[in-house]
């Protein structure tokens, strides 16, 4: 009976101490209105959507010496 009581008390202590650790380890969420500088916060999807980066398409084509030899052979 003594071992069972000691085991239950130990497990309860470990469970309760683990709960306080998870509360302390949580990351606090900041709404977009609270953000001051871009360098401080984590780059998430909302920041990436806000940044508009324009890039022109590629003008590359096939090499002039590549006739039919560049195409893969299919059985």
Curated annotation (Swiss-Prot):
Sequence similarity: Belongs to the serine rich endogenous peptide (SCOOP) phytocytokine family.
Q: What is this protein called?
A: Serine rich endogenous peptide 20
> Where in the cell?
Cell membrane; Secreted, Extracellular space, Apoplast
What is the source species? Arabidopsis thaliana
Expressing tissues: Mostly expressed in roots.
Cellular-component GO terms for this entry: apoplast; plasma membrane
Q: How does it assemble?
A: Interacts with MIK2 (via extracellular leucine-rich repeat domain); this interaction triggers the formation of complex between MIK2 and the BAK1/SERK3 and SERK4 coreceptors, and subsequent BAK1 activation by phosphorylation.
Locus of motif SxS motif essential for MIK2 binding: 56-58
What's the gene?
PROSCOOP20
Mind giving the lineage of the organism this protein is from? Eukaryota, Viridiplantae, Streptophyta, Embryophyta, Tracheophyta
Q: Which residues form the signal peptide?
A: 1-25
Q: Which function does this protein serve?
A: Brassicaceae-specific phytocytokine (plant endogenous peptide released into the apoplast) perceived by MIK2 in a BAK1/SERK3 and SERK4 coreceptors-dependent manner, that modulates various physiological and antimicrobial processes including growth prevention and reactive oxygen species (ROS) response regulation. Inhibits root growth.
Q: Where is this motif: SCOOP motif?
A: 52-66
Segments carrying the region annotation (Disordered) are: 54-75
Q: Which UniProt keywords apply?
A: Apoplast, Cell membrane, Cleavage on pair of basic residues, Membrane, Secreted, Signal
Q: Major place of localization?
A: membrane
Its transmembrane ranges are: none
């Amino acid at each position: 009976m003594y071992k069972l009581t000691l085991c239950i008390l130990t497990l309860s202590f470990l469970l309760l101490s683990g709960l306080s650790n998870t509360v302390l380890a949580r990351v606090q969420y900041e709404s977009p209105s609270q953000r001051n500088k871009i360098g401080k916060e984590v780059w998430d999807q909302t920041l990436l959507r806000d940044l508009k980066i324009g890039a022109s398409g590629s003008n590359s084509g096939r090499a002039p010496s590549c006739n039919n030899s560049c195409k893969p052979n299919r059985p």
